[in-house]
């Protein structure tokens, strides 16, 4: 378990630093397009998590430390949107379309509502 925690932590640092670097670079070069870094890391993260998930399905012998380190740590540090996308896709693939679309809708609209509520609370 300690090796898994260490792998997730180390890879998480790398993913987080990459996300920070992307945001810093975009802010310095295109300040009006601040959202571009988030969009880029979300899309790249989705591509990476899809590749890793598919690769790990084909290679069950890959140790849990590597699996968790790369998916939970690195990709999770880079973006949590990729995990959300994979969860939705897995629900669809398992024939649970109603749950998948409910999850999608609640995540997006609930997230926007929760963010608005949090911002509103700071104005009280």
Curated annotation (Swiss-Prot):
List where in the cell it is found: Cell inner membrane
What GO molecular-function term can you cite, just one? Answer: metal ion binding
Record's keyword annotation contains Protein transport: no
Its primary localisation, in coarse terms, equals membrane
**Mind telling me which residue stretches traverse the membrane in this protein?**
5-25, 38-58, 69-89, 97-117
Keywords attached to this Swiss-Prot or TrEMBL record, sorted alphabetically, are: Cell inner membrane, Cell membrane, Ion channel, Ion transport, Membrane, Metal-binding, Sodium, Transmembrane, Transmembrane helix, Transport
Protein name (record): Fluoride-specific ion channel FluC
- Residues bound to Na(+) are 76, 79
Task: Keyword check for Oxidoreductase, yes or no.
Answer: no
Q: Record's NCBIfam families?
A: PRK14234.1
Query: Record's superkingdom?
Result: Bacteria
Question: What lineage does UniProt assign to this protein's organism?
Answer: Bacteria, Pseudomonadati, Pseudomonadota, Gammaproteobacteria, Pseudomonadales
Query: Function, please?
Result: Fluoride-specific ion channel. Important for reducing fluoride concentration in the cell, thus reducing its toxicity.
The gene is fluC
Which Gene Ontology cellular component terms are annotated?
plasma membrane
Name the protein family: Belongs to the fluoride channel Fluc/FEX (TC 1.A.43) family.
Catalyzed reactions: fluoride(in) = fluoride(out)
Q: How does it sit in the membrane?
A: Multi-pass membrane protein
What is the activity-regulation note?
Na(+) is not transported, but it plays an essential structural role and its presence is essential for fluoride channel function.
Question: Per the UniProt entry, what is one GO biological process?
Answer: cellular detoxification of fluoride
């Amino acid at each position: 378990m300690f090796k898994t925690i260490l792998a997730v932590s180390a890879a998480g640092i790398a993913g987080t630093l990459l996300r920070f670097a992307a945001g810093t670079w975009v802010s310095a070069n295109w300040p009006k397009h601040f959202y571009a870094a988030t969009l880029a890391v979300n899309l790249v993260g989705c591509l990476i998590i899809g590749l890793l998930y598919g690769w790990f399905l084909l290679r069950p012998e890959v140790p849990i430390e590597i699996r968790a380190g790369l998916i939970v740590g690195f990709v999770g540090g880079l973006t949590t949107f990729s995990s959300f996308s994979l969860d939705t896709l897995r629900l669809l693939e398992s024939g649970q379309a109603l749950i998948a679309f409910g999850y999608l809708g609640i995540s997006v609209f609930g997230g926007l509502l929760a963010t608005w509520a949090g911002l509103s609370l700071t104005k009280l």
